[in-house]
Curated annotation (Swiss-Prot):
Record-linked HAMAP family: Ribosomal_bL12
Signal peptide range in chain numbering: none
Subunit structure: Homodimer. Part of the ribosomal stalk of the 50S ribosomal subunit. Forms a multimeric L10(L12)X complex, where L10 forms an elongated spine to which 2 to 4 L12 dimers bind in a sequential fashion. Binds GTP-bound translation factors.
Keyword Ribonucleoprotein part of the UniProt annotation: yes
Natural source organism: Burkholderia mallei (strain ATCC 23344)
GO MF annotation terms: mRNA binding; structural constituent of ribosome
Function of the molecule: Forms part of the ribosomal stalk which helps the ribosome interact with GTP-bound translation factors. Is thus essential for accurate translation.
Entry's Gene Ontology cellular component terms: cytosolic large ribosomal subunit
Similarity comment: family membership: Belongs to the bacterial ribosomal protein bL12 family.
Protein name: Large ribosomal subunit protein bL12
Length: 124
């Protein structure tokens, strides 16, 4: 004797949240499955660019100094106004934020200066 889908749906519809939770656990044990949500890959670069454009504040992060460390230190000094020692410590401690809470234009400008000096930079 088979039970119709409508009968099952009607039974589930009348259950409380606690009863539904117990039902899900019983399904997991009986069939060896998990009710955890599956992570779905989002759109590639287009989606990330759209999300970045919606942000109003950015953090410029120095990911890696690269091979021309002196030029990167000079760029950090120019962007932040730090002294030589502070700029060198920041570059040596990469990955570190260079500027925080800046608008898109300032973040892009700082990123360009650092990349032109040979650094790897991320905007967050």
């Amino acid at each position: 004797m088979a039970i119709a889908k409508e009968d099952i749906l009607a039974a589930v519809e009348g259950m409380t949240v606690l009863e539904l939770n117990e039902l899900v656990k019983a399904f997991e044990e009986k069939f060896g499955v998990s009710a955890a949500a599956v992570a779905v890959a989002g759109p590639a670069a287009g989606g990330a660019a759209a999300a970045a454009e919606e942000k109003t504040e950015f953090t410029v992060v120095l990911a890696e100094a690269g091979s021309n460390k002196v030029a990167v230190i000079k760029a950090v000094r120019e962007i932040t106004g730090l002294g030589l020692k502070e700029a060198k410590d920041l570059v040596d401690g990469a990955p570190k934020p260079v500027k925080e809470g800046v608008d898109k234009a300032s973040a892009d400008e700082a990123k360009k200066k650092l990349e032109d000096a040979g650094a790897k930079v991320e905007l967050k």
